[in-house]
């Protein structure tokens, strides 16, 4: 019996990998100007232009229960076991909703196997858990081995990023422990990371340039101690800056490094101009 993986839209996995490994994606939504939009249906550039044209800070919401149930049922009806990997339970109610959906599907298909993992993060730090798990599943690995691989990636990965401005962190609301620190660091540029499922501060510096230098040095330090499993540069509407950072990593590590835009659900909390990197080691 094959293992199929379901994730959510905040993994920001490149489309070609979603198609290659047959990954199912359920979409979170954003609400702006009293209108709700599924993240997967949004054009990033247009959304951030819309966000900049209003004083309202958009909010985000978890995938609908119906979409969760439909995705799980489709996988089960195809004769698969189902592994769900979702955004940190401390950042969204998606993980909790998935358990409700699971119980409803199991009422209809009591012999099905559905497992749900808290990625404890978002963006491609979560995406790597999903992609590596999907690779294992496609190679014919059993559910327990796929889960072990996902957990291994989770434990050997990191996401470092720096916002262009603190405005969205101050107003956004869902940034974990970082929110308690913002008031005292208004003159500081924070390098953010995710630890124990929450956004927190990795280091505080004075300029974005210095922040990027520190991020590069940390990534190189980690990736020279161990073999690199994967690395991707994330950006929010600053593609040229993202490509420049990716080229820098390629030069230093001698491996291909792609770039991937972060969508609105995470972007509303850090804002346009944010840049960072997600990576894992073997």
Model-derived features: positions:
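Glycine-rich, highly charged phosphate/nucleotide-binding loops
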Residues: 61-71
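N-terminal glycine-rich anion-binding loop in soluble enzyme alpha/beta folds
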Residues: 4-62
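Glycine-rich loop at the start of a catalytic domain that most often binds anionic cofactors/ligands
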Residues: 43, 76, 97-100
């Amino acid at each position: 019996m094959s293992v199929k993986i379901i994730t959510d839209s905040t993994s920001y996995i490149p489309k070609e990998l979603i198609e290659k490994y047959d990954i199912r994606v359920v979409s979170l939504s954003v609400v702006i100007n009293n209108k709700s939009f599924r993240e997967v249906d949004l054009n990033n550039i247009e959304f951030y232009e819309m966000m900049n044209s209003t004083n309202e800070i958009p909010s985000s919401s978890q995938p609908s229960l119906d979409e969760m149930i439909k995705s799980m049922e489709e996988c089960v009806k195809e004769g698969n076991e189902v592994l769900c990997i979702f955004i940190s339970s401390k950042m969204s109610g998606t993980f909790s909703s998935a358990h409700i959906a699971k119980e409803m599907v199991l009422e209809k298909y009591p012999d099905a196997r559905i497992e749900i993992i808290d990625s404890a993060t978002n963006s491609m730090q979560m995406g790597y858990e999903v992609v590596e798990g999907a690779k294992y599943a496609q190679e014919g690995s059993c559910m327990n081995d796929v889960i072990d691989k996902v957990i291994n990636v989770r434990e050997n990965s990191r996401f470092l990023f720096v916002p262009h401005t603190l405005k969205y962190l101050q107003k956004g609301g869902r940034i974990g422990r970082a929110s308690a620190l913002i008031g005292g660091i208004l003159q500081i540029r924070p390098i953010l990371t995710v630890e124990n499922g929450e956004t927190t501060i990795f280091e505080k510096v004075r300029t974005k340039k210095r922040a990027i230098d520190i991020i590069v040095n940390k990534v190189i330090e980690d990736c020279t101690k161990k073999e690199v499993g994967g690395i991707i540069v994330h950006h929010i509407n600053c593609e040229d800056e993202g490509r420049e950072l990716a080229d820098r990593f390629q030069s230093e590590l001698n491996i291909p490094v792609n770039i991937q835009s972060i969508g609105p659900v995470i972007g509303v909390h850090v804002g346009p101009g944010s840049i960072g990197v997600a990576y894992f080691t073997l």
